[in-house]
Amino acid sequence: MIQVLLVTILAVFPYQGSSIILGSGNVNDYEVVYPRKVTALPKGAVQPKYEDAMQYELKVNGEPMVLHLEKNKQLFSKDYSETHYSPDGREITTYPLVEDHCYYHGRIENDADSTASISACNGLKGHFKLQGEIYLIEPLKLRDSEAHAVFKYENVEKEDEAPKMCGVTQNWESYEPIKKASQLVVTAEQQRYLNPYRYVELVIVADHGMFTKYNRNLTEVKTWVYEIVNTLNEIYRYLYIRVALVGLEIWSDGDLSNVTLSSGNTLDSFGEWRKRDLLRRKRHDNAQLLTAIDFSGNTIGRASIANMCDPKYSTGIVQDHSPINLLVAVTMAHEMGHNLGLHHDGKSCTCGDYICIMNATLSHQHSKYFSNCSYNQYWDYINTYTPKCILNEPLRTDIISPPVCGNELLEAGEECDCGSPRNCQYQCCDAATCKLHSWVECESGVCCEQCKFRTAGTECRARRSECDIAESCTGQSADCPTDDFHKNGQPCLNNFGYCYNGNCPIMYHQCYALFGSNVYEAEDSCFESNQKGDDYGYCRKENGEKIPCAPEDVKCGRLYCNDNSPGQNDPCKIFPSNEDEHKEMVLPGTKCADGKFCTNGHCVDVATAY
């Protein structure tokens, strides 16, 4: 028998305030509410500190509302760790018990489009979407009171300043293959392939400035990070990605990589530190630096594009630029989106009536959704680059809680969980038992269609260039066969290039991708600068030192382009070295002379190399 326990007595007063200073900033037009918690527990059951599911009744705009919350069991991995440093520099790592945490996702009753991301640690703090509008809620700091302030995000006073920007300068329109892909809708086949979740095991590093900003209090920093990741996890559910926090590192005794006003230098230094240090002691897929520094210009974040799983470049940096955790979480979602192959949205990209996550500028309008372009770019990235690290599911923390069939969470003993039989949209799953139907051959994969292997000979990976080979399903597997391509060194593009790992790299295409149309390969004289061995010209790096090119290798160092676009006249244009150093160099495999191609900063013979 289930009894309903009224934990507190409803005392909702429709009090309207005109202005108040809250944790989220200066707020105009807020409402004071007293939420009532209603818990359904089996008779005689001991109430845990933080239940797996809760509901609250409150009034918003004078209308009753029921907020349903469910603990975010995807928030932490079982091997979650926290690291900080003693005043004498000693590394201190702990493995706290995080099963009984207080971070929830939820929805509003009778509002199918509603969402919520809430911390219930000390009252209710977070945001929820009601009838298409974002509301923030936080407890008022009144002694012996359950009073909370509820207010629309639009009523938070905005700073009178220039728009906040992402530091990535590459625009969506410059990528022709992705531009074409964005003109498509998300097909049923793509949806089937995306349906199985990917898993990003995330480490967040809070720099020394964050430690100082939050009163040198480790608990305050942790709480802020947990709130951000809870929202980040909610945002990425729309891309079928689960973000699990596997580690939090706080640089309490000083920064371990260079954190400067230059976002480019900060990102590069952080990536080097991750590769050299963090990866050796903590298994993870992606690391984000959360910093209190105010980067030069309007930049609030930066990341490398399409480098998830890379030891150095699977990183991002995010400025802690707002007292509203939603806005910082959106910025982190944006930068991680770059790691996952997403570019800034162009004019034709849309996510309904909202500003989209991958907009280059952080809008004063709320943004929690990815655009149609982002969906297609993510699909293209997964299918082309197949980043293996995000396929493994993190160790789960919910081993204490018994599985509940129908809650849309895949738990111990379940093969699938698509919700109630009435709401289940996943035909492979028997919603009544949370087991796969007996006739199911596969659940996911490019060669899986309606839970069956696709017919042998069905193309599953189109060739991306004349150097590539199209692959077809075997009829015996859900996976597309290993990507194969024509032999390296084979002439391509009318002898302007040579095949290299399935592509035909030529300098013109690289210049076009970096700078747009009307930009071409520079004259040979520009490449002579690569003999200098400085920021403007070199062939490779050895232990951080820029090595000058030998005369015969000058076209295998820094890339020089001739920019004839309107308003420009730069015959020897180079890509800024502080933005993304591997983009400033001539790509491996590029033709550097007749019968020769570039490799590791040298121009070598095709015949002998292959």
Swiss-Prot record:
GO terms for molecular function: metal ion binding; metalloendopeptidase activity; toxin activity. Zn(2+) binds at residues 334, 338, 344. Glycans are attached at residue 217. The active site is at 335. Ca(2+) 2 binds at residues 404, 407, 411, 414, 417. Its cofactor is Zn(2+). Expressed by the venom gland. Residues 1-19 form the signal peptide. Residues 20-188 form a propeptide. Binds 1 zinc ion per subunit. Its EC number is 3.4.24.-. Keywords: Calcium, Cell adhesion impairing toxin, Disulfide bond, Glycoprotein, Hemostasis impairing toxin, Hydrolase, Metal-binding, Metalloprotease, Protease, Secreted, Signal, Toxin, Zinc, Zymogen. InterPro entries: ADAM_Cys-rich (IPR006586), Disintegrin_CS (IPR018358), Disintegrin_dom (IPR001762), Disintegrin_dom_sf (IPR036436), MetalloPept_cat_dom_sf (IPR024079), Peptidase_M12B (IPR001590), Peptidase_M12B_N (IPR002870), Reprolysin_adamalysin (IPR034027). Residues 198-394 form the Peptidase M12B domain. Disulfide bonds join 309-389, 349-373, 351-356, 405-434, 416-429, 418-424, 428-451, 442-448, 447-473, 460-480, 467-499, 492-504, 511-561, 526-572, 539-549, 556-598, 592-603. Belongs to the venom metalloproteinase (M12B) family. P-III subfamily. This is Zinc metalloproteinase-disintegrin-like 3a. It comes from Crotalus adamanteus (Eastern diamondback rattlesnake).
